[in-house]
């Protein structure tokens, strides 16, 4: 209630999964019931704009358990749902346990296509879903939420009418943002920087922005072009050729003509009304497509 009274109008709650076993494997410290209590407390405090974060393609997760998570959340009728597919990042505890499995899945596509020795190695494990299962989860998410009035406006984000997350849209449209606090990231003009994540250093230099800010980077024109495309293609409306021309003073075809033509021919990119966006097939290989726009 204190947040609400202070003027905070939107909350984001990280459920990730409605399965206690999946939460445990992720190393989450909350339970399904604790999330439910938090959600109800937010409603009781007057919050009418709540996002719930979900995560698919978890170790041991089946299409059925993912559907149960969706049912659980949809029954609560949040205004916004973010549903991301798990990425096993290097340097994390999950990577230590599943890094090799990720690499093998990327190489062979599914467990049935792996050599016998690898099939034996992973037999009985809490395995990561293969590509087909991951795609099925994504499709089920999109169709289920569409039936309930959620519009997908970004690869992994769904919102009720007029409830898009303006915060995230600012990132995808490369608007300036200023991060406050430990480890917070910022983008101001062409300058990108991150605050120190060391509490002692942060307190010692409180008020001295130059010492608090670390990992500074001045983006080149090529960096900005790459980000314009990479981030813009995440949105269902895609990127505007007119906006590209106005921002960079050159046509999108002059810079990316060969890449655009390649993916249009493959049916992974579409062009309509002066905008370029991912096709349905392109969404499933979006990272590979978008990476080709980084100069």
Task: Annotate the PLM regions.
Residues 250-264:
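Short amphipathic alpha-helical interaction segments
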Residues 275-279:
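Minor-groove-contacting beta-hairpin "wing" of winged helix-turn-helix DNA-binding domains
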Residues 281-295:
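Short, amphipathic alpha-helical interaction segments positioned at domain boundaries
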Residues 65-66, 255, 289:
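Residues at alpha-helix caps and immediate loop-helix transition turns in enzyme cores, especially N-
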Residues 264-274:
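A short, conserved structural fragment
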Residues 1-250:
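C-terminal scaffold of the Radical SAM
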């Amino acid at each position: 209630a204190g947040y609400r009274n202070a003027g905070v109008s939107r909350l984001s709650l990280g459920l990730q999964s409605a399965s206690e076993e999946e939460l445990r494997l992720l190393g989450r410290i909350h339970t399904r019931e604790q999330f439910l209590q938090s959600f109800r407390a937010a409603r009781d405090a007057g919050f009418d704009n709540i996002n719930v974060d979900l995560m698919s393609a978890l170790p041991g997760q089946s299409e059925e358990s993912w559907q149960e998570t969706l049912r659980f959340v949809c029954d609560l009728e949040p205004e916004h749902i973010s549903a991301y597919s798990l990425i096993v990042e290097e340097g994390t505890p999950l990577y230590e346990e599943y890094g090799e499995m990720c690499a093998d899945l990327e190489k062979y596509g599914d467990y049935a296509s792996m050599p016998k020795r690898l099939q034996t190695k992973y037999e009985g494990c809490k395995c990561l879903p293969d590509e087909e299962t991951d795609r099925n989860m994504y499709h089920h998410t999109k169709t289920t939420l569409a039936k309930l009035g959620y519009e997908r406006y970004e690869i992994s984000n769904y919102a009720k009418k007029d409830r898009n997350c303006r915060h995230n849209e600012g990132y995808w449209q490369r608007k300036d943002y200023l991060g406050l606090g430990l480890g917070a990231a910022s983008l101001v003009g062409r300058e990108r920087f991150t605050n120190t994540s060391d509490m002692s250093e942060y307190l010692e230099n409180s008020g001295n922005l130059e010492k608090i800010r670390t990992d500074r980077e001045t983006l080149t024109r090529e960096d900005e072009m790459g980000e314009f495309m990479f981030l813009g293609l995440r949105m269902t409306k895609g990127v505007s050729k007119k906006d590209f021309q106005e921002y960079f003073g050159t046509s999108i075809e002059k810079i990316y003509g060969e890449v655009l033509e390649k993916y249009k021919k493959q049916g992974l990119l579409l062009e309509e009304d002066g905008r370029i966006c991912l096709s349905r097939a392109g969404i499933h290989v979006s990272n590979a497509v978008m990476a080709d726009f980084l100069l």
